[in-house]
Regions:
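A general structural signal marking secondary-structure boundaries and capping sites
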Residues: 48, 67, 80-84, 111-112
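Stable alpha-helical elements in mature extracytoplasmic
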Residues: 69, 73, 100-101
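N-terminal export/targeting leaders of redox proteins
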Residues: 1-32, 112
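Conserved helix-turn-beta segment immediately C-terminal to the redox Cys motif
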Residues: 61-67
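Sequence/structural segment immediately N-terminal to covalent heme-attachment motifs in c-type
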Residues: 30-47
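Axial heme c-ligation environment in periplasmic c-type cytochrome domains
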Residues: 43, 52-61, 78-105
Length: 112
């Protein structure tokens, strides 16, 4: 007996949607890494290991429970800071736009 073939496009569409979202997230993350390179963040920081400054994953862990973490990081990025991770100061980056500083802060907080 011949069974009618039921064609469904939902799994294919769902698969494409998931791939598209993953690609968008990866591109956004890559763009923020480029932004970090362009602004010399990676001269003192790395994602997973401590260099001169703390690893971004350690920053993300430290601020994970804080509701104002993004704003606090933006302030440190733009105005500099000292004493949060030892005695070595983090230089200010006042020429970095608030928007770009926020992108960097959000990217850093996802590093855990």
């Amino acid at each position: 007996m011949h069974q009618p073939k039921i064609e469904t496009r939902f799994p294919s569409l769902l698969y494409r949607l998931i791939l598209s979202a993953a690609s968008f997230i990866a591109c956004d993350s890559f763009a923020n890494e480029i932004l970090a390179q362009k602004n010399d963040c990676l001269g003192c920081h790395a994602v997973a290991v401590k260099l001169v400054g703390p690893a971004f994953k350690d920053v993300a862990i430290k601020y994970a429970a804080e509701s104002d973490a993004t704003a606090r990081l933006v302030e440190s990025i733009r105005n500099g800071s000292v004493g949060k991770w030892g005695n070595l100061p983090m230089p200010a980056h006042p020429k970095l736009s608030p928007s770009d500083a926020k992108k960097l802060a959000e990217w850093i907080l996802k590093a855990k």
